[in-house]
């Protein structure tokens, strides 16, 4: 096993003391046992727990084969999905690939350009994307359990039409890959009818926990990331976080501290990074915790920030605003690349004290200074140390946060594996759009909106 993630809770004191963590050990162990024995709420959606070792090896091989086909066939790869159907793969690709991967020349990329669609309903976004890719060789991966989720369904209808006009029906079917339910749903029916190659979203894995299934694996493999290493990282994390000793299990300690802080009125957790490539990891994390914990009038509100950028916008609030915040810093110990700051003879900017230092050294001092400043201002700080940004550690991070999320949800007395609240806006939208069966509701809503 390679070096693992490590957790530094020094700057959560004096807000949470060690004895408070110890007091929570038995209840956290009980919640973990509930997960493991599959006796708690949402127990039909716990397939993610053993996924790193129990994944479908035959399908995994097909995914890698399909990824090679896409890389050899297409200039552009369009990933159509929303929420858990795209955030995990985008988080991995942005974290591990070149920051400007889509702008590199093809011989530098060695993989297609990758764009995401179906995660909004903006006509401008879609029109701009079509304008960008229409004259290029295109492959599409449409990801939807049902095939009727509005945003990806609209996007796929548009791209299906484009590909069929461009390549004909036979040519299009060779370039469309569907990730969907094993047997039912509109997308499964369409894929079988048209003859698309398909990959299965497991019945026992919910969308926000699905990045290590074909949902995330195909786009990640197309990007050139080593999915074997990613699964190895997740498998090693699964083994490491199986300990029921809170002194040894970082998941237990993270769950204990964030919930102790929540009980003391720290109701907002900010996941903070100092690497721009972690932005979409924060977006993935927000969905994971927001949908899992935010119900029954409870839950820690998940927010994310990109430092040092957001220190120049949100820094004032974090330092001196309402004291309901705690932060979880992702500290990347070793950057992918280095840049040395050179000496300037004139030194008009006064930066020669940084001469011959790596930019990453400056970045780390910014992180350390921020932790101290915010802590002095009444904001507890959890620091999660990550040795490097690689496929292996992406797998570790995913499993760390997924397991912590499941335990934490049970600790808060909610079902962390459902999301009943997301249907409310959809019903209103369908009624306002005039979907059949919503006529009475439409009239009521239109009256309320006057």
Curated annotation (Swiss-Prot):
It is an enzyme of class 5 (isomerase). One of its GO terms (cellular component) is cytosol. Keywords: Cytoplasm, Gluconeogenesis, Glycolysis, Isomerase. InterPro entries: G6P_Isomerase, Phosphoglucose_isomerase_CS, SIS_dom_sf, SIS_PGI_1, SIS_PGI_2. Pathway: Carbohydrate biosynthesis; gluconeogenesis; Carbohydrate degradation; glycolysis; D-glyceraldehyde 3-phosphate and glycerone phosphate from D-glucose: step 2/4. Its EC number is 5.3.1.9. The keyword Transferase does not apply. It is found in: Cytoplasm. It catalyses: alpha-D-glucose 6-phosphate = beta-D-fructose 6-phosphate. It comes from the Bacteria. The keyword Zinc does not apply. Catalyzes the reversible isomerization of glucose-6-phosphate to fructose-6-phosphate. This is Glucose-6-phosphate isomerase. The gene is pgi.
């Amino acid at each position: 096993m390679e070096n693992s993630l490590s957790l530094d809770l020094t700057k959560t004191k004096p807000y949470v003391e060690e004895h408070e963590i110890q007091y929570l050990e038995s209840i956290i162990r009980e919640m973990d046992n509930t997960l493991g024995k599959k006796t708690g709420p949402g127990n039909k959606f716990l397939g993610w727990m053993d996924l790193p070792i129990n994944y479908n090896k035959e399908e995994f091989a097909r995914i890698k084969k399909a990824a090679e086909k896409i890389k050899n066939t297409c200039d552009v790869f369009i990933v159509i999905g929303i929420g858990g159907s795209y955030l995990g793969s985008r988080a991995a690709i942005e974290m591990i690939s070149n920051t400007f991967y889509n702008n590199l020349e093809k011989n530098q990329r060695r993989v297609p350009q990758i764009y995401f669609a179906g995660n909004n309903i903006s006509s401008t976004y879609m029109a701009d994307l079509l304008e960008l890719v229409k004259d290029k060789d295109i492959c599409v991966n449409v990801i939807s359990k049902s095939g009727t989720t509005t945003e990806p369904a609209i996007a796929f209808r548009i791209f299906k039409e484009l590909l069929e006009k461009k390549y004909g029906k036979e040519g299009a079917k060779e370039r469309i890959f569907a990730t969907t339910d094993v047997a039912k749903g509109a997308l499964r029916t369409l894929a079988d009818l048209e003859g698309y190659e398909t990959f299965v979203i497991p019945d026992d894995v919910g969308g926000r926990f699905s990045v290590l299934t074909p949902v995330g694996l195909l786009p990640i493999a197309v990007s050139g990331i080593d999915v074997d290493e990613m699964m190895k990282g997740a498998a090693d994390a699964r083994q490491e976080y199986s300990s029921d000793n809170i002194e040894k299990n970082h998941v237990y300690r993270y769950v204990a501290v964030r919930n102790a802080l929540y009980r003391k009125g720290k109701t907002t957790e900010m996941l903070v990074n100092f690497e721009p490539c972690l932005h979409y990891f924060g977006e993935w994390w927000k969905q994971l915790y927001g949908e899992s914990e935010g119900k029954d009038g409870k839950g820690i509100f998940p927010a994310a920030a990109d430092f040092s950028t957001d220190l120049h916008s949100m820094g004032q609030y974090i330092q001196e605003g309402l004291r309901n915040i705690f932060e979880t810093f992702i500290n990347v110990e070793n950057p992918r690349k280095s840049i040395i700051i050179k000496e300037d003879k004139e030194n008009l900017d006064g930066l020669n004290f940084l001469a011959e230092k790596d930019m990453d050294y400056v970045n780390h001092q910014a992180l350390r200074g921020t932790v101290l400043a915010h802590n002095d201002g009444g904001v507890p700080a959890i620091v999660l140390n990550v040795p490097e940004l690689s496929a292996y550690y992406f797998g570790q991070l995913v499993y760390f946060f997924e397991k912590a999320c499941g335990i934490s949800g049970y600790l808060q007395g909610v079902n962390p594996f459902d999301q009943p609240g997301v249907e409310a806006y959809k019903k209103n939208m369908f009624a306002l759009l005039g979907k059949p069966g919503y006529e009475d509701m439409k009239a009521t809503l239109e009256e309320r909106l006057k």
